[in-house]
Amino acid sequence: MTKNKELTKKEMLEIFNRRYACKKYDKTKVVSDEDFMAIIEAGRLSPSSFGLEPWKFILVKNEEMLNDMREFAWGAINSLNGASHIVMVLARKGVTGDSDYFERIGKEIKNISEENLKIRKEFFTKFQKEHFKLLESERALFDWASKQTYIAMVNMMNMAAALGIDSCAIEGFNK
């Protein structure tokens, strides 16, 4: 292993060690647009099963919406108060081989030919139906997408830590 790889390994471990779940934010500290976009890009570039990226990122800026969220955010009130950016990382529902989303990702994002898209669709459907039984319930399918979404969220949080920015994953929403 070269000296540069050792340094990189050491730096990465320091970032992971520094990252923690921040429970209270300083309202006077604002994340720059450049840093925020780097955090979002880390999420966007995250790996996912079949490259489908079954997630959506929503920046919540609307104070009225934040107030509405507080009503359902069990245990997250301090995090919602004071954070300079609130990003909702949502899992997409209904991502199947037959979905418009699957086709759009294949054609428009991945530039896959019709012939190859058909092959991928058949393979993906077999994966979901036979190997992982994801098509037996909406819940199973959503749980699969949620697991993919966590990959993006963790990469975003690690990028934030690398930039010296605190973050916290919040799951406790009642609605």
Question: Which residues are covered by each model-predicted region?
Answer:
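Acidic, surface-exposed loops and disordered segments
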Residues: 1-175
